Structure formats: structure tokens, C-alpha cells
Amino acid sequence: MEKTLIIATRNSGKTKEFKKLFADFGYEIKDLTDYPELSEIEETGTTFEENARLKAEQIAEITGQVVIGDDSGLCVDVLGGLPGIWSHRFSAPDPTDEKNIAKLLHELAPTAITPERRSAHFHTTLVAAKPGRESLVVEADWDGYIALAPKGENGFGYDPIFMVDAFRTAAELSEKEKNQVSHRGQALRKLMAELPEWLYK
């Protein structure tokens, strides 16, 4: 069985989560930092699946390897699903996690006294690609609310403002807790249920 998978990302936080989640399955995980000669794949899609496919399928063609493309984002209901596929670039032109969070909290300021209007979910689409093979696609969501201010030291991205229950943000969960319930953890378990058969059908 092929035991090396390339994750189509240079995001160290994302790679760390994948390594942790795949460890139980005995896979070696590489990411695009292991392939510095590969140019950046532009995310020109209009959906999570289109972007995940672009990354996975293009890099699979170039490397000849099995590649997992991940496109994830935070979708806030009152903002019509934004930041969505633009989550990582929400505070462009020079986005950082801190600036993305600050912009989102600013956009949600009018809803501060109505927490029920701050409902949101994280979404992940994973695409497994291999040359000459129809890609495998799985998706998952993680429901929650947007906090009034960042809390917690763990995780990355919008985790410090994503309330997973009445008391804690995603950044206050341990790695193990987060991986059991998160959008990426759920999607990965779906992927692992189908990946072995897909690799060899």
C-alpha cells in the first residue's frame, strides 16, 4: 500500500493537523515545503471543492504521487457564508490570522448583543487525486458561534473566536479533543474509510 501522501499546502498548522490525524493510519505525510520547486497553485475556483481539486489534481499530475487537496473555511451565516473560500485571504492584501480575526469581529460588531445571530460553521472539502484516476471527494462541517473576542492558545486561523460550546473556543481544546470533533477531523475519517479501496479499485 502507498504510505506517502502529499498534502497540497504550505500551511504548517494544517500540515501538523494532518500528520496527527494520519499517524494512526501509518502514513508518512509530506507537504509542499518538501517540494520547493513547485510553484504556488492559484486558488481560482469559486467553491471549496473547485479549489481543493485544483491543488490536488495539478500537483498529482506534476509529482505522479497521491495528493490530498484541502480547502477549508469559516462560513458565518449573517454574512451570507463569508469569509468562506476567502477565509485565508479575508484581510488581503497582506493577510495574517490576527488581521483576519480582527476584520471578522469588526464586520460582526452590530450583532454583539444578539449571540444567536453569530452562528457559523467551519467547512472542509478534501480531494484525493492520483494521475489517471477519478478524484475522491469528501466534505464535513463543524457548527459553532463566533465569540466576542479571541480566547485560547491552541490551533490556528479562526480557532480563537470559534465557540464550540457555551464556554470554550476551538483554540481552548486540546489537539486530541479538536481532532475528534473538527471539520477536518471528520472529513479525514471519511476519507480514510474510502481511501484504501479508492487507491486500488
UniProtKB/Swiss-Prot annotation:
<dbReference type="GO" id="GO:0005829">
    <property type="term" value="C:cytosol"/>
</dbReference>
<keyword id="KW-0378">Hydrolase</keyword>
<dbReference type="InterPro" id="IPR020922">
    <property type="entry name" value="dITP/XTP_pyrophosphatase"/>
</dbReference>
<comment type="function">
    <text>Pyrophosphatase that catalyzes the hydrolysis of nucleoside triphosphates to their monophosphate derivatives, with a high preference for the non-canonical purine nucleotides XTP (xanthosine triphosphate), dITP (deoxyinosine triphosphate) and ITP. Seems to function as a house-cleaning enzyme that removes non-canonical purine nucleotides from the nucleotide pool, thus preventing their incorporation into DNA/RNA and avoiding chromosomal lesions.</text>
</comment>
<dbReference type="GO" id="GO:0009146">
    <property type="term" value="P:purine nucleoside triphosphate catabolic process"/>
</dbReference>
<comment type="similarity">
    <text>Belongs to the HAM1 NTPase family.</text>
</comment>
<keyword id="KW-0460">Magnesium</keyword>
<dbReference type="GO" id="GO:0035870">
    <property type="term" value="F:dITP diphosphatase activity"/>
</dbReference>
<dbReference type="GO" id="GO:0009117">
    <property type="term" value="P:nucleotide metabolic process"/>
</dbReference>
<feature type="binding site">
    <location>
        <position position="42"/>
    </location>
    <ligand>
        <name>Mg(2+)</name>
    </ligand>
</feature>
<feature type="binding site">
    <location>
        <begin position="9"/>
        <end position="14"/>
    </location>
    <ligand>
        <name>substrate</name>
    </ligand>
</feature>
<dbReference type="Pfam" id="PF01725">
    <property type="entry name" value="Ham1p_like"/>
</dbReference>
<dbReference type="GO" id="GO:0036222">
    <property type="term" value="F:XTP diphosphatase activity"/>
</dbReference>
<feature type="active site" description="Proton acceptor">
    <location>
        <position position="71"/>
    </location>
</feature>
<keyword id="KW-0546">Nucleotide metabolism</keyword>
<dbReference type="InterPro" id="IPR002637">
    <property type="entry name" value="RdgB/HAM1"/>
</dbReference>
<dbReference type="GO" id="GO:0046872">
    <property type="term" value="F:metal ion binding"/>
</dbReference>
<feature type="binding site">
    <location>
        <begin position="156"/>
        <end position="159"/>
    </location>
    <ligand>
        <name>substrate</name>
    </ligand>
</feature>
<comment type="subunit">
    <text>Homodimer.</text>
</comment>
<feature type="binding site">
    <location>
        <begin position="183"/>
        <end position="184"/>
    </location>
    <ligand>
        <name>substrate</name>
    </ligand>
</feature>
<feature type="binding site">
    <location>
        <position position="71"/>
    </location>
    <ligand>
        <name>Mg(2+)</name>
    </ligand>
</feature>
<dbReference type="GO" id="GO:0036220">
    <property type="term" value="F:ITP diphosphatase activity"/>
</dbReference>
<feature type="binding site">
    <location>
        <position position="72"/>
    </location>
    <ligand>
        <name>substrate</name>
    </ligand>
</feature>
<keyword id="KW-0479">Metal-binding</keyword>
<keyword id="KW-0547">Nucleotide-binding</keyword>
<feature type="binding site">
    <location>
        <position position="178"/>
    </location>
    <ligand>
        <name>substrate</name>
    </ligand>
</feature>
<dbReference type="GO" id="GO:0000166">
    <property type="term" value="F:nucleotide binding"/>
</dbReference>
<dbReference type="InterPro" id="IPR029001">
    <property type="entry name" value="ITPase-like_fam"/>
</dbReference>
<dbReference type="GO" id="GO:0017111">
    <property type="term" value="F:ribonucleoside triphosphate phosphatase activity"/>
</dbReference>
<protein>
    <recommendedName>
        <fullName>dITP/XTP pyrophosphatase</fullName>
        <ecNumber>3.6.1.66</ecNumber>
    </recommendedName>
</protein>
